[in-house]
């Protein structure tokens, strides 16, 4: 039986105002070297964050659809995480639970879908292309599998470019939360072709 695509028609642009600032100019200041000891120290601190959670505003923009939602990301281990998207009324639109070897997605009708590839399942069910495997690193301010990145004047990621299977993602870090240690992204934008993903992290809890 073919999988039915999840309809996001109920996701109203409540997050539009919150995400509008995501188009602001990235942090200014002289670029710093990715080989600098300050970056290596910051990177090491980020890699030590085995458990974290963050919530905020999510927007997916493409020629075919525009999706606005609230999101909650909870990472409990390097290969275990939960992603929740809710509409402005607080109702669950999508819940993704990823564990080693198996992914379960629950849609807004309560139907469960199981796969071993979370990124492919999201694509088939929602039409959204989200690089989940890399996003687990990027959302923390880590470059993941790419070495093509630049730093800001505080030795944090400013921009990265990631290429895989002929697809190129560019991630711009527009603001950081300095109320947590180490500093973590509070605004970022991912772009690939004609699609963009905007994330605004309201708060972080780390361990």
Swiss-Prot record:
One Pfam match, given by its short name, reads LolB
Record keywords: Chaperone included? yes
Membrane topology note: Lipid-anchor
Quote the cellular component terms of the Gene Ontology held in the record: cell outer membrane
Q: Which family does it belong to?
A: Belongs to the LolB family.
Q: How does it assemble?
A: Monomer.
Q: What is this protein called?
A: Outer-membrane lipoprotein LolB
Species per Swiss-Prot/TrEMBL record: Yersinia enterocolitica serotype O:8 / biotype 1B (strain NCTC 13174 / 8081)
